[in-house]
Amino acid sequence: MKIRASVRKICEKCRLIRRRGRIIVICSNPRHKQRQG
């Protein structure tokens, strides 16, 4: 999980989701997991 100021999709399988007021990215590739800090 990377914590970043700006999250974005890295590949076409990445999905942007809003959870508890935070933007997170989930993907089939675990390296692409991100959360807004």
From Swiss-Prot:
GO terms for biological process: translation. One of its GO terms (molecular function) is structural constituent of ribosome. Keywords: Chloroplast, Plastid, Ribonucleoprotein, Ribosomal protein. GO terms for cellular component: chloroplast; chloroplast envelope; chloroplast stroma; ribonucleoprotein complex; ribosome. It comes from the Eukaryota. The keyword Ribonucleoprotein applies. It is found in: Plastid, Chloroplast. Its main location: plastid. Pfam families: Ribosomal_L36 (PF00444). Belongs to the bacterial ribosomal protein bL36 family. This is Large ribosomal subunit protein bL36c.
